[in-house]
Amino acid sequence: MGEIQTLNAKQNAGQPVIRLSGISKSFDGKEIIGNLNLDVNHGEFLTILGPSGCGKTTVLRMIAGFETADNGQITIDNQDVTNVPAEQRHVNTVFQSYALFPHMTVFDNVAFGLRMQKVPAAEIEPRVMDALKMVRLESMAQRKPHQLSGGQQQRIAIARAVVNKPKVLLLDESLSALDYKLRKQMQIELKQLQRQLGITFIFVTHDQEEALSMSDRIIVMRSGVIEQDGSPREIYEDPKNLFVARFIGEINVFEATAKERLDENRIRAEIEGVDSVVYFDQPVTEGQKLQVLLRPEDLRIEEIKESEEKGIVGHVTERTYKGMTLDSVIETESGMRVMVSEFFNEDDPDVDHSLGQKVAITWVESWEVVLSDEQEI
């Protein structure tokens, strides 16, 4: 077990384990990936996130060697593998279907790759059992796949991949077949296993929650292009454009007009007809259209009387109790629907708002993200 755990101990952390340089790929004359450049570091959990058809699985398949790039270069551990067949690359893939052999035992499934590589029999058994111990399934070595739960099958597929000592483990929508509770459990287990092994994981998903909860780093893709590359916190709290902001979780987008610059960090802007101060350090001109982005959990609402005017105001049109939070929809005077998420405190008489209640919407200064006006494509 120690041998696999220290797999990457001698790797050079100064060089990326995978580098994609100028990669492009087309199918039937349609460009899917265009001039993509990406470095993946040793030992990191990288998630490629994006909607269906954005090219994320194509990127994974080109790294694995299942697809050939039309242009560009792919290197793994500083070796050019652009035209190297899949079976000669030091990567393994865990697919959504797991692809376990139904007629083989768990042990034989995990040992299959080693036998294909003609690893000596005396070495196979300890390596297989070490891999099964990592996923806590050594007691099920003699069972068949149909005797296992979905989560157990997924862990066997991972054991079969890591027993080959890959430099990189590729996971293609590997949790999507599991139910919600099991998927949450496997998210934790996958991240723990990745830390234990020290192997680079590249995970492809369209599920934003999976990406945020497991990743060291997230790549957000759209139409074959990387829209943003950053940590989960950077992606969520500081989206670089409207597409990323709307793709990662819920967000409110207020239309705004710049009025004047107050200092190097702040400007005065009109939002929903109300003078407001927002943080924006980019060049701006009077009258310039902007978009002010705020997550539902960043907003606060205060109940006010119908006769009161207090900043941005609206009326509660929907409310949803979700246990830990109370989610409300506020319709402003302009007709905009604003989502607000508040932690539910049963001892607070003001947290459960009545439908039709007039409220004032506020937020902590600097929590907003301000973008130059753009229309989502």
UniProtKB/Swiss-Prot annotation:
Listed SMART domains = AAA (SM00382)
What top-tier enzyme class does this entry carry? Answer: translocase
Question: According to the UniProt entry, what is the EC number of this protein?
Answer: 7.6.2.11
Location within or outside the cell: Cell inner membrane
Ranges for the ABC transporter domain?
18-248
UniProt keyword annotations, A-Z: ATP-binding, Cell inner membrane, Cell membrane, Membrane, Nucleotide-binding, Translocase, Transport
Recorded catalytic activity of this chain's protein = ATP + H2O + polyamine-[polyamine-binding protein]Side 1 = ADP + phosphate + polyamineSide 2 + [polyamine-binding protein]Side 1
Topological type in the membrane: Peripheral membrane protein
A GO molecular function for this record? ATP hydrolysis activity
Q: Which PROSITE patterns match?
A: ABC_TRANSPORTER_1, ABC_TRANSPORTER_2, POTA
Q: Which GO terms describe its cellular component?
A: ATP-binding cassette (ABC) transporter complex
- Name the positions where ATP binds: G50, P51, S52, G53, C54, G55, K56, T57
Q: Which family does it belong to?
A: Belongs to the ABC transporter superfamily. Spermidine/putrescine importer (TC 3.A.1.11.1) family.
Q: What does this protein do?
A: Part of the ABC transporter complex PotABCD involved in spermidine/putrescine import. Responsible for energy coupling to the transport system.
Assembly information from the UniProt record: The complex is composed of two ATP-binding proteins (PotA), two transmembrane proteins (PotB and PotC) and a solute-binding protein (PotD).
Q: Which protein is depicted?
A: Spermidine/putrescine import ATP-binding protein PotA
Query: What is the scientific name of the source organism?
Result: Vibrio vulnificus (strain YJ016)
Q: Which gene encodes it?
A: potA
